[in-house]
A protein has these predicted regions:
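Phosphate-handling catalytic cores of nucleic-acid transaction enzymes
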Residues: 2-424
């Protein structure tokens, strides 16, 4: 017997084949509806039923790309610090299956249609601070420099960037920290000195949870690079075997509205809090500044106030406003709350110790457990005993490894095993 879907389900692939996927057990609760505010929220709602990508991945990347296109013509001032509309974002999800790249493809096409000039300023390949400065350098002597010093760096394999920042002589980490702060960048080499006085740099990175836990070191947590990123977990949210509509925004006029918002925001200048938003911000600021943060996830969320006000600025500019209103703060707080939940989920039990993460990976590959001697063998005898002990202690403290004793003909042998991971 042949059955047919109802007539109202025969109108497009999203309705006929699209099955919404439930969130895995333990997955962070999604952002509140307030996060999908205004123009950007409307764009995401139009795209959502036509893609397997997580709507929050589209929203977060769209916010960052929008701010990159706007440039330094708008800012919110806190004492002597100017917060321009540029952010660093790290999407965390399974390789290929989380549809991080799919979400970015939608955003890239949209932002390029709204502002064709930004296309040439979307770059990949972060490997050194020198390369970053050179891409946004001022003119000097016979070198005309780069006239458009906006830069949107997109790194689909962000683990390689974290590896680069951990090299002993790497200048990438301090350069990125200064870029997020909006400070002048300088390259002090004898052969090719360069300076960027007013760069506007935004960054989008994609990484898996295991790679994040493995490569995020205590050093990057201590020096502040990690907490300059907004961390957002994303997943595949539906199944569309034949994909959704090729251009879900066609005929909506939303791309033109976005283009107008970008042009308007470029001359916004100093953006203030609307009078009705001040009380909300004062209350939220106190909550964010005094909220206890434990472990690596807490360290990653240490710049909550700065991220929240930058997000509020982005929402306001996307609305064509030159004041931050209560709805913009509410949207920013909803997205920041999700970022905190994402950090807790992604980094629960992380050690910040690369050796500990390396040993943990070996333990996962050997469900029967490993002795100390076997652990040393797996590490090719490149680590001293005291370093291995410190790493095992860190894994034990994080609840990710357990020690048992196995009887032998002589002294009992220690057997180390990975603690079963909670289902995520």
């Amino acid at each position: 017997m042949t059955t047919h879907p109802p007539a109202d389900q025969q109108q497009g692939h999203a309705e006929t084949a699209g099955g919404v996927l439930p969130a895995p057990t333990g997955w962070p609760a999604p952002p509140g509806p307030a996060a999908y505010h205004g123009l950007l929220g409307e764009i995401v709602r139009r795209l959502e039923p036509e893609t397997e990508a997580d709507p929050v991945a589209i929203l977060a990347q769209l916010l960052v790309a929008f701010g990159a296109a706007v440039g330094r013509g708008a800012y919110f001032q806190v004492e002597a610090t100017r917060h321009h509309p540029h952010e660093f974002l790290l999407l965390v999800g399974e390789s290929s299956r989380a549809r991080k790249g799919t979400a970015w493809d939608h955003v890239r096409r949209l932002i390029s249609d709204a502002d064709p000039t930004i296309s040439q300023r979307i770059l990949t390949g972060l490997s050194s601070g020198e390369g970053v400065v050179w891409a946004v350098r001022d003119g000097a002597g016979s070198d005309p420099g780069i006239s458009d010093r906006r830069l949107l760096a997109v790194e689909p394999e962000f683990a390689s960037v974290l590896k680069s920042t951990n090299r002993e002589i790497s200048t990438l980490s301090p350069t990125l920290r200064s870029a997020w702060d909006g400070r002048p960048l300088q390259l002090l080499t004898r052969t090719s000195p360069a300076r960027s006085s007013d760069a506007h740099i935004a960054l989008i990175g994609h990484i898996t949870q295991p790679d994040l836990r493995h490569h995020l070191t205590a050093l990057e947590l201590a020096n502040g690079l990690a907490n300059r990123f907004l961390l957002i977990c994303c997943r595949r949210t539906r199944l569309l075997p034949e994909g959704g509509a090729s251009d879900p925004l066609h005929g909506t006029g939303l791309t033109a509205v976005l283009a107008g918002a970008i042009r308007h925001a470029r001359t916004a200048g100093r953006v203030h809090l609307h009078e009705q938003a001040r009380e909300l911000w004062h209350h939220a600021y106190h909550q964010l500044a005094t909220r206890p943060g434990a472990g690596i996830a807490g360290a990653l969320c240490a710049r909550a106030e700065a991220h929240t006000i930058r997000l509020a600025l982005l929402y306001a500019l996307a609305d064509g406003e030159r004041q931050i209103k209560p709805e913009h703060l509410a949207a920013a707080l909803a997205l920041w709350d999700y970022a905190e939940r994402s950090a807790t989920w992604a980094l629960d039990g992380a050690t910040g110790d690369p050796l500990a993460e390396q040993i943990h990976a070996q333990l996962l590959n050997h469900p029967g457990g490993l002795t100390r001697s076997q652990i040393s063998d797996a590490l090719q005898h490149n680590q001293p005993a005291h370093a291995i002990q410190c790493a095992l202690d860190a894994l034990t403290l994080a609840g990710r490894a357990t020690r048992t004793r196995r009887p032998t003909a002589g002294r009992p042998a220690e057997l180390w095993s990975a603690t079963p991971e909670p289902v995520a």
